[in-house]
Amino acid sequence: MAAAQISAEEMEELREAFTKVDVDGNGHISTDELNALFKAANLPLPGYRVREIIQEISRTMDLNQDGKITFDEFAKVVHDLKSSEVAKTFRKAINKKEGICSVAGTSEQSGTQHSYSEEEKVAFVNWVNKALEKDPDCQHVLPMDPSTDDLFTAVGDGIVLCKMINLSVPDTIDERTINKKKLTPFTIQENLNLALNSASAIGCHVVNIGAEDLKEGRQHLVLGLLWQVIKIGLFADIEISRNEALIALLRDGESLEDLVKLSPEELLLRWANYHLEEAGCPKINNFSSDIKDSKAYYNILNQVAPKRDEEGIPAIPIDISGIREKDDLKRAECMLEQADRLGCRQFVTATDVVRGNPKLNLAYVANLFNKYPALKKPENQDIDWSSIEGETREERTFRNWMNSLGVNPRVNHLYVDLADALVIFQLYEKIKVPVDWDKVNKPPYPKLGSNMKKLENCNYAVELGKKEAKFSLVGIAGQDLNEGNRTLTLALLWQLMRRYTLNILEDLGDGQKIIDETIVQWVNETLTQAGKGTISGFKDGSISSSMPVLDLIDAIQPGSIRYDLLKAEDLTDEKKLNNAKYAISMARKIGARVYALPEDLVEVKPKMVMTVFACLMARGMRRI
């Protein structure tokens, strides 16, 4: 893998550049995206030269000639060709996209430039303005003016970010923990800690973003984080266990399992094509070049608009006469006027449609789907409904943890997306277990024998776990990972997460070996010094009330816990959950990156309880 020869700092730059070109975020760069990049960059080059450069980039980067450039291919070639004319032109294009504002970086290296998309800023500002327009706690910064830099100052106190996180994943942050009045630099810092650690807990990749970056309104970091939060909210219901009507998208000869494997982006594309097919119109392959003429959008709007066939829902007729408009921009504007009648004009301008901005068009379609899916759950199909299971809390915690570390591709379905072990290898690297990437088969896999390639990866992943990581993997074989055996996959993931957590403590404690007893001892010493009660271990029944966790937070940061908000006696499950929500949010607020959920405390789940105390111990040790 390219990682072996490239410094961490350069790797981060390459990752940022890749993300800028891979605008639909699907983990690879297509020719469409290269064309869009050079068109938007507006470089002073004749058209034939741009075409030659794109061909050269495709030829040299697409190492296996499958029409897709993966991050590994991208990193290797950009690194190897650093001084070539093609690579220089490519980098220039990345930095000069029209509608992309370049901002001098703050690192010591001269010449560091970061950029952000003006179109994205406008889209996100309008979305946040609408989402929070009635929230009394945000009136001091809303509405923001999309034509200015309002957004970058508005996020500076953390309140807007906390609110947006709660809109995307309700109940992530306990409102009682957000500092809202008479803000000081210290209480602002707490809000930003709370926002960042909560974003991490819902699966945002925030490893390189600090509270200071948000306070100072670093544009590319603010937009990057906000997009992740918005996208998680938009995609929340594009998932079969939460929306069984999606089964209408099953094609002939497909099983339910085939549909479950699709990512939210793939499901959205299939949904769009389902409605286009119903309308007797040509299908689309993407939300960039194929939607530029707005015709597909017109037909989808016409299909999903209410027709007065459901009781109590008034019809909203769509005027599609604008589809005959000769000018692309005018046609797009007419189409958006019709979308506005459905209350679905968000995220794109007519220009964004005509330019085929993949990220904003994806958001536009996701929002349309959420409001008007226009799908009916099939009545007579022979479907095993019991096989549609939503993910458990434990599975969601592991998935969010992995995604917060920036694994690529993003994990949407725990077992399906680990079947080739690529994500597991990345997690091994995060816990300092060396991976020989020459032994790893990388996608795209051949049509014939693809599962054998994935199985070889899984066998190597288990071998690494046993020999290098010294994990207890008795009875676990590569086949179990490849086939998505729940119990055995979770056993490996737990050991990865545990080692990751303990490594943080060992790094803070000069490499001293940390075991469960070390954490319990530290917790009890800290509680005793603060005059508070102790615990017997991670199964202690008192943890169900969350009081030991709250007491520890108050011992680490004296005076931080408002005990008047808590219930300590006659505890019902509801009161316990209320305490636990407050405890988890307070842990994040004082700077602990906690992934566990409130229910884990109420039910005293020892594994997740251990991670809560370990993260608090890491936060406590940082005071020294």
Swiss-Prot record:
It is a peripheral membrane protein. Ca(2+) 2 binds at D62, N64, D66, K68, E73. SMART domains: CH, EFh. Residues 118-373 are annotated as: Actin-binding 1. Coiled coil: none annotated. Residues 118-234, 262-373, 392-501, 513-621 form the Calponin-homology (CH) domain. One of its GO terms (biological process) is actin filament network formation. Ca(2+) 1 binds at D22, D24, N26, H28, E33. GO terms for molecular function: actin filament binding; calcium ion binding. PANTHER family: FIMBRIN/PLASTIN, PLASTIN-2. This is Plastin-2. It comes from Danio rerio (Zebrafish).
